[in-house]
């Protein structure tokens, strides 16, 4: 734990320093005077209001001295505030201790905190209370806190030890393991701990245990899927790979034999329906997931992620056939096959028959719809996880599917209506994936604490950038909230918070009832108000609990009107008040000076004096803020005045229309800009402070209207940018920072779009140079030779036509992906344009209001407005160019590439009817599209100065760029030969080399028969008699078998 610096302050130290200062000014043998008593009560009231937190070390350093000083205050003054704080010291301090634990530090830090609690509730503290005749059984006192907290720590340590004991490897050895999400964390929020539930260390313990155990339930469900014999072997294999990738990834991760053995057994059951043989698979490209799956299957181990160089491996089938197979994948868990589903929902690389694709999509849609139905019927975390995981929607695939669909969405956004972008299978898979991502993002912090509550609020709110995507899926935000709210809702135990508040109120009332003096009763009301203001603000910020009505109502003396203060007649005489006493109050109000405390007199401690305090002290505080320039030193000074105004009269006087709450809110809004210079203000911050200043202004206005006419101070106009330095300077700072921020975002967007556009030009140039080549049919069927268009004697290489077309499609798809990225960036740019437009309007509005502050302020916002307008023009110009770039259905310069690929798809469907004739037709088609593309490229690239003729180096670079991943075919290459095996049969006529049938056998003229003499003499030969005997044996055996049957 870090050391405490000498200039560091925290609430307990501030209280200690104030009480020490008071003690140093008074004699220990003499009773304290009214002024010292008032200052002590004010100090305790300020501590009740303090919103700061403390570390364990800070409390260790100061709690004894502070506790002793509070007891000294009580001994000298018998004030109820000191009694309340001393008797409930333990709870009120622990409520302010902030802790942060992790897997390695929780034991040491929790033991340290436990020792601190033991000291604060030990014999020494109890004896101090007893000597002063104070209770030790107060609700937050030592006799109540120590048993409760020590029991909680015992439960916490047991829960944390259990949570961190569980490991994936440990759970594999459990025969039957049943675990409900949140069980361990729920024990830390039992009803018996409701009094300390809101304490920060309790919430930190709940957070730690929730995160430490949140992975267990998903792991158990997924592991169960890897061993479920109802699933097919391939389904179990894919679940096992997902399990290993999520829970056993890393250099030192264990490799349990149970998983290895079952995986190897399942791999042995795979056949040609699930795998493509290595010889055929090596000529095709694989995604990273397919490489990972192929490596695991080849080595029969899910812990192998890559294929060793030079090794051939079978490839997992990912076409529509694997989806349609009744024996390969379990029908309810088709989503676990990541690569196959991605191909169907992305429409990438689909070259099968349209009917087969439609059938596969329909089957996948039905499978995903059953998952969606199961989600709809779920009502608990376990049921929801089972509905997702058992149907193949594990964490990895949900992320991949949502990402793929977002890419697809941006590629098609704007070209068709939002409702028509996705087909049925994309919508249902997307809906389940979106829900899955939300669930997996929440489940690992699921628990009854504030951490899960904040995560829940963040994850269930769909960002504006995703709103169009969610709507295109047909998924409503209300449905997401309904499902999550039904299955894994937050459990914040608001009743515990309200019960703790009720206990605090009851304790304050009990202390007040024991007070004999009227002044003490009034002061405990003020202390109660301060403590409740702190508690209610905290409950609202952390838990979102709106304070009870009674905490916000006016708490004035019955002599003061408490209805509509806007209609108060200031000339109405107050009951029991004479002119002399009123004059004395006016005189006292005129002597109020910052930072002096309130003078203690009969007139100043009456509730009637409160309106004078508001009209002077609060008006000074308001003026100090509105006249300050937005800077750390000036705001620091204003903050001190605000704090002084909030605490003024606290021991004796209640709030006036909740003025202390409004001052406290203003303090909270300003503090961030006085503590950390890196906190940049926004226009929303400025508007918030303007609103808070307005609320305080209304309170001051009411108080002034209640004063006698001759005593009313001048009330300035309501604070706004036209009359407030802090608002105009804060708006100016915020708008300047926002201009820089939006300009930086625009620059990043421009830079990214520029790079993407350059890539498109490179791709277009590569296609242009590539199609200037001469394409000639190779000697081997299904191949094509590439030549320089003007140098036919120099071949650039021979490739399979299938490889050439695949390479062209990949490059074209890469260009399409770039267009999709550009469309996505264009959506971000439009968001930036909207934000810039809003800031421009705000800038103009403030410029009009700034007229009253002089021409310098007007000029500042005029220049800012011109800068915003210039940025807007730049953004709109860029947006116009992007719209032109993305308005086509194909990347620029590639329309005929799209036409060629479309024709190739048609030819692929009927390719079985073609032999060499198909090769010639494809060569002709390629030559034709090359000529068309050349004309098109000459036109499209003229603006960037591209030469009309491609030089040899450019052509070679283009061919290398397109075909770099595909092997060159030589004349004697055997790669076209397909080996028949149990895992492969000929499915395509292009796989057969028919040229062999056309080659005639011609005997050489110079056959040397003597070269065969050695073999003829030395090797054993089969004689004719031996052959006859074998044939007779076979036939005779057949006859006898027939005779026996007869």
Swiss-Prot record:
Principal localization reads: virion
Map out region (Interaction with large tegument protein) in residue numbers: 543-1046
Matching entries from InterPro entries are given as: Herpes_UL37, HSV_ITP
GO CC annotations? host cell Golgi apparatus; host cell nucleus; viral tegument
One Pfam family it belongs to: Herpes_UL37_1
Q: Which family does it belong to?
A: Belongs to the herpesviridae inner tegument protein family.
Function, as annotated, reads: Plays an essential role in cytoplasmic secondary envelopment during viral egress. Interacts with the capsid via the large tegument protein/LTP and participates in its transport to the host trans-Golgi network (TGN) where secondary envelopment occurs. Modulates tegumentation and capsid accumulation at the viral assembly complex.
Q: How does it assemble?
A: Interacts (via C-terminus) with the large tegument protein/LTP (via N-terminus).
Protein name per the record: Inner tegument protein
- What gene does the UniProt entry assign to this protein? MDV050
């Amino acid at each position: 734990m870090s050391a405490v610096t000498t200039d560091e302050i925290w609430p307990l130290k501030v209280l200690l320093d104030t009480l020490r200062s008071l003690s140093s000014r008074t004699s220990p043998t003499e009773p304290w005077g009214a002024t010292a008593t008032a200052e002590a009560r004010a100090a305790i009231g300020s501590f009740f209001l303090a919103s700061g937190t403390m570390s364990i070390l800070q409390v260790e350093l100061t709690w004894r001295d502070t506790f002793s000083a509070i007891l000294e205050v009580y001994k000298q003054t018998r004030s109820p505030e000191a009694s309340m704080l001393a008797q409930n010291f333990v709870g009120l301090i622990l409520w302010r201790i902030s802790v942060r634990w992790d897997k390695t530090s929780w034991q040491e830090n929790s033991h340290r905190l436990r020792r601190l609690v033991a000291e604060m509730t030990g014999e020494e503290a109890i004896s101090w209370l007893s000597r002063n005749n104070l209770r030790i059984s107060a609700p937050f006192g030592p006799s109540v806190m120590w048993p409760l907290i020590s029991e909680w720590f015992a439960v916490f340590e047991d829960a944390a030890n259990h949570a961190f004991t569980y490991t994936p490897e440990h759970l594999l050895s459990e025969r039957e393991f049943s675990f409900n999400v949140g069980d361990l964390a729920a024990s830390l929020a039992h009803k018996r701990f409701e009094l300390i539930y809101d304490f920060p260390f309790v919430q930190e313990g709940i957070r730690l245990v929730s995160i430490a155990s949140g992975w267990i339930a998903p792991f158990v469900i997924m592991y169960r899927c890897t061993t479920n014999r109802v699933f097919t072997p391939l389904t179990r294999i894919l679940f096992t790979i997902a399990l290993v990738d999520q829970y056993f990834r890393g250099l030192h991760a264990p490799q349990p034999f149970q998983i290895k053995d079952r995986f190897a057994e399942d791999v042995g059951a795979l056949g040609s329906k699930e795998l493509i043989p290595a010889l055929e698979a090596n000529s095709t490209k694989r995604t990273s997931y397919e490489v990972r799956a192929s490596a695991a299957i080849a080595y029969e181990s899910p812990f192998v992620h890559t294929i060793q160089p030079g090794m051939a491996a079978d490839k997992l089938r990912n076409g529509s056939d694997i989806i349609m197979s009744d024996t390969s994948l379990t029908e309810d868990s088709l989503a676990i096959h990541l690569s196959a589903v991605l191909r169907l929902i992305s429409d990438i690389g689909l070259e099968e028959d349209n009917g087969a694709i439609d059938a596969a999509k329909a089957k996948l849609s039905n499978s995903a719809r059953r998952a969606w139905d199961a989600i709809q019927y779920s009502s608990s975390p376990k049921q929801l996880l089972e509905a997702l995981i058992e149907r193949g929607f594990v964490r990895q695939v949900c992320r991949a599917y949502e990402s793929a669909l977002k890419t697809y969405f941006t590629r098609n956004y704007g070209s068709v209506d939002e409702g028509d972008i996705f087909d049925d299978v994309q919508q249902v898979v997307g809906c389940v994936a979106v829900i899955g991502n939300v669930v997996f993002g929440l489940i690992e912090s699921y628990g009854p604490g504030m951490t899960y509550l904040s995560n829940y609020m963040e994850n269930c709110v769909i960002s504006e950038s995703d709103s169009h995507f969610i709507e295109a899926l047909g998924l409503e935000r209300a449905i997401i909230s309904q499902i999550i709210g039904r299955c894994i809702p937050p459990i914040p135990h608001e009743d515990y918070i309200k019960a703790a508040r009720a206990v605090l109120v009851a304790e304050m009332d009990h202390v007040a009832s024991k007070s004999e003096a009227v002044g003490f009763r009034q002061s405990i009301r003020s202390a109660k108000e301060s403590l409740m203001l702190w508690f209610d603000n905290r409950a609202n910020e952390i838990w979102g609990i709106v304070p009870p009505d009674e905490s916000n109502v006016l708490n004035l003396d019955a002599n003061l009107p408490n209805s509509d203060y806007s209609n108060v007649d200031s000339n109405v005489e107050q009951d029991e008040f004479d002119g002399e006493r009123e004059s004395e109050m006016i005189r006292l109000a005129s002597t109020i000076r910052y930072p002096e405390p309130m003078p203690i007199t009969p007139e100043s401690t009456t509730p009637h004096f409160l309106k004078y305090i508001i009209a002077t002290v609060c008006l000074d505080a308001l003026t100090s803020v509105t006249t300050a320039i937005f800077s750390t030193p000036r705001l620091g000074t204003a903050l001190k005045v605000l704090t002084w105004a909030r605490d003024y009269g606290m021991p004796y006087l209640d709030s006036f229309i909740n003025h202390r709450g409004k001052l406290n809110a203003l303090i909270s809004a300003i503090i961030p800009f006085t503590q950390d210079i890196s906190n940049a203000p926004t226009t929303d911050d400025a508007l918030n402070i303007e609103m808070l200043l307005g609320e305080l202004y209304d309170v001051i206005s009411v108080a002034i209207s209640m004063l006698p006419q001759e005593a009313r101070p001048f009330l300035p106009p309501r604070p706004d940018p036209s009359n407030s330095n802090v608002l105009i300077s804060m708006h100016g700072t915020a708008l300047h920072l926002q201009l820089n921020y939006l300009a930086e975002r625009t620059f990043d967007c421009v830079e990214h779009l520029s790079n993407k556009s350059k890539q498109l030009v490179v791709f277009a140039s590569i296609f242009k140079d590539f199609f200037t080549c001469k394409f000639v049919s190779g000697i081997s069927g299904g191949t094509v030779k590439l030549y320089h268009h003007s140098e036919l004697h120099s071949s650039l290489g021979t490739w399979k036509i299938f490889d050439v077309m695949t390479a062209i499609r990949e490059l074209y798809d890469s260009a399409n992906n770039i267009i999709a990225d550009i469309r996505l960036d264009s959506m971000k740019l439009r968001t930036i344009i909207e934000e810039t437009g809003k800031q421009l309007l705000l800038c103009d509005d403030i410029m009009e209001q700034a007229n009253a502050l002089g021409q310098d302020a007007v000029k500042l916002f005029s220049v800012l407005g011109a800068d915003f307008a210039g940025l807007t023009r730049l953004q709109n110009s860029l947006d116009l160019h992007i719209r032109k770039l993305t308005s086509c259905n194909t990347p620029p310069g590639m329309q005929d590439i799209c036409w060629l690929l479309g024709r190739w798809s048609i030819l692929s469907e009927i390719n079985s009817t073609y032999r060499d004739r198909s090769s010639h037709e494809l060569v002709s088609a390629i030559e034709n599209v090359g000529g068309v593309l050349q004309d098109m490229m000459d036109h499209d690239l003229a603006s960037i100065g591209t030469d009309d003729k491609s030089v040899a180096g450019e052509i070679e670079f283009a061919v290398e760029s397109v075909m770099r991943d595909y092997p060159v075919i030589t004349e004697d290459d055997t790669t076209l030969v397909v080996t028949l095996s149990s895992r492969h049969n000929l499915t395509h006529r292009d796989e057969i080399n028919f040229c062999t049938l056309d080659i005639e056998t011609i005997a050489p003229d110079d056959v040397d028969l003597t070269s065969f003499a050695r073999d003829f003499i030395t090797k054993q030969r089969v004689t004719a008699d031996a052959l006859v005997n074998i044939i007779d044996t076979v036939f005779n055996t057949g006859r006898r078998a027939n005779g026996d049957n007869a």
